[in-house]
Structure formats: structure tokens, C-alpha cells
Amino acid sequence: MPQFGRPTTDTTREAWEEDDGTTVDIWDQIDEAVADDLDFIRSAQVPTTDAYVTKLGTLTDPLQSTSHVVRYRYGKDTAAGAQINLVVELRQAYVSEASQGTLIASLTHTDVASGWTAGTFTLSGAEADAITDYTNLYVRITANQI
């Protein structure tokens, strides 16, 4: 049976904010079951490896190494124009930027396009097997202007 680990709390927020500029509990802008491009989070206008980390809701071990998929949407403001690179990571046991836990998998997007793009990466069997605690998973996003 499919499981979905959606954001449940902000763990680290370095210069990230909601689409309206507020900075309290921004995870609730990205926790929907169906993507809503009218509410989102954003990095600083000129990001310098600014990190955002959210804890995912509790999942149970599916007892298989297949069909572990991380899905998200990303884009940039056309007005900003500069090259922005984005790294999306799945981590286990993240505590802080000084103690990032175990990197399970990641994907780098170079020169993010304007507008919204669906992002996804599927864990390999070895990456899925590296997860030992499905209740302690995080998504870490970093944005960097080149």
C-alpha cells in the first residue's frame, strides 16, 4: 500500500520563507496531497547554499527496496534571472546543519528554469535499504546562486 511522507515541521530554515514573506511554520505551504503552485516556499533572492529542512510524517518500513520515490516541485522567479542551482536530499536522523544525519539520496538541479517543474528521484535498492528508521526522515533543500 502506498505511503506518503509529507512535511510536518520546519527543522532548519536559513533565509527561506513563505510566498508572502512570512517565516513562521513555512512547511504548511508544501504539505498538500495535490500540488498547489499558489502557495510555496522560497529561498533568499540571492541564495548562498541556504538550507531548508523539513521533517517528514511517520512512515512504516514497507519491507521492500523498490518504489521509494521523492517528489517535489521547484522553479525560480524569472525576474531574478540569475543561475540558481538546487540540491534536494533525503536524509535520516537530521538534527542540524552541524549534525546532518545520514544522506540517503540526492539530486542536483543545475540552472533551475523559471516557472514550475516537477522534480522526482527514485531511490536505488541500496539507498532504500540504507533507511533504518522510517520515522526519522527529512528532506533537505539548498539553493545557491552561481
Residue locations for each model-derived region?
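Disulfide-rich extracellular domains of secreted proteins
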Residues: 1-146
